[in-house]
A protein has these predicted regions:
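Boundary/entry segment of secreted carbohydrate-active catalytic domains
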Residues: 121-156, 171-179
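Beta-strand-rich modules
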Residues: 96-108, 474-494
Length: 511
């Protein structure tokens, strides 16, 4: 009996020891899963403001016995992935300026489900361009709620150990810029090693003072970029004006590319300054040209340099009218850019606010980084709802409709002349770029009433490549006074859009 008691005691001790081991192991596993849940997602960082486009969700693959991961964005399943490597990555695309949530759900082989903590992040299109000479010396990009930047170089300010450290945590986009002592292949290799997603290419190759390349030479350079790009997404060469208006440089460059070369152009980088400003329609016309670029090339657009400035027109920062013009332009254009899903990113060019000719387009002072009123407007626009943005007490909204139709309707049509003839009149119209045709409307009523007695009629005429469109309207009533107006129309994505009516011309028909 005594022997039996000893045996039972030993069995009980072993059982207790074993159960303790199981309990300890269970606690360890629970600790591991809790730790993983809190530390799973590596990027984006919590509450981070990041640039629109392709976004990486990265997480640690440190849980044991994972069967598969599920990636959720805003609560919607986007991808199911098998575990592989130390760090997992899922890439998704968005140009919506808003806040997002990301969560990773791990399904283990024993059917246990482990969820990561929810990660909040915010997306903006807004960026900034700075150089190491003076533009980047003092400014804090966070003061304008910026999501990305570039510096006309393939190395970031951080890589250059630049004195202003406030750019260190901001997404950097490298640029080839032009021919350099460092080969294209080495610049692309460097960018890939750094983990950058994009590469801007040649800067204003159509200008002698910039990268200065002929279209045929640029095609060779473009091939070099394609051969060296690795995982980089390439932006187009940025001509000094809208590509769609660059007949002497961009058109021959583009037409000389084969389909593979075109396919490797992930986005079009636009440099386009507004050289004059009449009224709000000027800003809408600017947006219309952006629309036309996308309609023609079907590629996402980055506006990497823009402002209101011109060597011939002055925009003085001490002139209230000039300041108001630039501010109105910014409000309208930024509203339109943020609304357009095909616009991925934009960055305003900061002219020195102390320059008497271009300073009205300055958004911050080079020496102090202090924002101008225009800079405060820039800071207030394009911020996702819910983001803890820096806000400024300046008006930054506009009631202007910036839809495609409204932008086309801002494009003017000009009638050079209307001349009376025998039972007829002739007209001369200034050609509108990329017009599909024109409408000539004439009536005995200056308001163009459709009542029968006013004989209001509209004639459609086709567009030509000529700079002036001439024609004649016949079979009119002699000695009667007719009112005449003209408007162009465009066809974009198969739909007809009408431009603005011309001024009304009055003509009295001859006998």
């Amino acid at each position: 009996m005594e022997k039996m008691k000893k045996i039972l005691a030993m069995v009980l001790s072993v059982a207790l020891l074993f159960s303790g081991m199981i309990f300890d192991n269970t606690v360890t596993k629970a600790d591991e899963t809790n730790t993983w849940s809190g530390e799973a997602i590596i990027s984006p960082e919590q509450n981070k403001l990041i640039g629109a486009g392709y976004i990486d969700i990265k997480w640690n693959n440190t849980l044991e016995n994972v069967k598969q991961y599920k990636v959720y964005i805003d609560g919607t399943l986007k991808k199911t992935m098998s575990p592989s490597g130390d760090i997992m990555k899922f890439e998704f695309y968005t140009t919506n300026v808003k806040g997002y949530t990301a969560q990773i759900v791990a399904e283990l082989k024993d059917n246990t489900v482990v969820k990561s903590d929810v990660r909040n992040f915010y997306v903006t299109k807004k960026g900034i361009c700075v150089n190491r000479k003076d533009m980047g010396a003092a400014v804090d990009p966070a003061s304008m709620n910026i999501g990305w930047y570039y510096d006309w170089d393939y190395k970031s300010l951080k890589d250059w150990n630049y004195k202003n450290k406030k750019f260190c945590d901001l997404e950097f986009v490298p640029m080839i810029w032009g021919d350099d002592l460092v080969d294209i292949s080495k610049r692309c290799e460097y960018a890939n090693r750094k983990g950058y997603k994009y590469m801007l290419s040649y800067n204003e190759p159509d200008l002698k003072g910039e990268s200065n390349k002929q279209p045929d030479t640029m095609r060779y350079r473009w091939n070099e970029m394609i051969d060296s790009k690795g995982s980089l997404r390439l932006g187009s060469p940025a001509t000094e004006t809208f590509q769609i208006n660059s007949d002497k440089w961009w058109t021959p460059f583009w037409n000389g590319l084969n389909q593979t070369q075109k396919n490797n152009m992930t986005f079009i980088a636009v440099h386009a300054y507004q050289h004059y400003y009449d009224n709000a329609d000027t800003a809408l016309e600017y947006l219309h040209t952006i629309d036309e670029i996308y309609a023609k090339y079907k590629k996402p657009i980055w506006i990497t340099e823009f402002a209101v400035a011109d060597s011939g027109n002055v925009f003085n920062p001490k002139n209230a009218k000039h300041n108001a013009q630039v501010q109105e332009f910014m409000k309208i254009v930024l509203k339109g850019l943020n609304e357009r899903s095909y616009v991925e990113r934009y960055s305003w060019f900061d002219f020195n606010p102390e320059d008497s000719k271009t300073g009205a387009s300055g958004i911050y002072y080079y020496d102090t980084g202090k924002l101008t009123t225009l800079g405060q407007i820039y800071a207030n626009i394009g911020n996702p709802a819910g983001y803890n943005a820096k806000k400024y007490n300046v008006s930054y909204t506009t009631s202007k409709n910036t839809s495609m139709a409204s932008c086309v309707a801002a494009v003017p049509t000009t009638v050079y002349s209307v001349t009376a003839k025998k039972k007829a009149f002739s007209y001369s119209i200034k050609s509108v770029k990329r017009a599909a045709g024109y409408q000539v409307q004439y009536s005995l009523n200056k308001k163009f009433s459709t009542k029968k007695k006013y004989k209001t009629k509209t004639k459609n005429i086709s567009a030509t490549s000529a700079t002036v469109k001439n024609g004649t309207i016949k079979k009119l009533t002699k000695k009667k006074t007719y009112y005449v107006r003209v408007r162009a129309y465009k066809v974009i994505n198969g739909k007809k859009y009408y431009c603005k009516w011309s001024k009304i011309n009055k003509v009295k028909i001859k006998k």
